[in-house]
């Protein structure tokens, strides 16, 4: 299997946007099926649509290729949005579940960095995107202390 194939073209951002929606819905339905309120679902989707729209616009004007490490970073972005909405919802502020999600996000951070070096798919966009997703997680964790 050739892992050096990238998703390119003007539809890469749009495909990533729909991937975000599907991934978020899968995450919500898999991780916390019994505790979820409608507020979490709507807040998560709203934030994700806003951030994904910006990402789609950036990908369209810069014509950046999406590779495997960037896709994993994108998964971390959606996971971080879900963590943020779980922290915002006071009723679902279950620290054990949130801690597991944060650890999963940190694990994926290591995986995407390793894969970008191993597959030789490091890009300037990937470096900046990874750093911004890391900063978003730091913001979320700082916000949770308030």
Residue ranges and their predicted role:
Residues 1-99, 108:
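Topogenic membrane-insertion module of multi-pass membrane proteins
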Residues 81-89, 136-146:
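Membrane-interfacial alpha-helical segments at the cytosolic side of multi-pass membrane proteins
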Residues 88, 92, 118-122, 146:
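Transmembrane helix-loop junctions in multipass membrane proteins, especially transporters and channels
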Residues 101-140:
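Acidic (Asp/Glu-rich) catalytic motifs at the cytosolic membrane interface
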């Amino acid at each position: 299997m050739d892992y050096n194939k990238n998703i390119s073209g003007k539809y890469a951002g749009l495909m990533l946007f729909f991937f975000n929606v599907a991934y978020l819905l899968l995450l919500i339905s898999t991780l916390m099926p019994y505790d979820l309120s409608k507020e979490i679902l709507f807040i998560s989707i709203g934030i994700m649509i806003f951030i994904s729209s910006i990402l789609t616009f950036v990908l369209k004007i810069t014509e950046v290729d999406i590779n495997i490490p960037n896709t994993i970073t994108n998964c971390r972005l959606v996971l971080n949005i879900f963590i943020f909405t779980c922290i915002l919802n006071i009723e679902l502020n279950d620290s054990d579940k949130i801690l597991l999600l944060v650890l999963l996000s940190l694990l994926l951070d290591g995986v995407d960095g390793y894969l970008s070096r191993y597959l030789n798919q490091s890009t300037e966009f990937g470096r900046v995107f990874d750093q911004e997703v890391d900063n978003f997680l730091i913001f979320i964790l700082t916000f949770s202390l308030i």
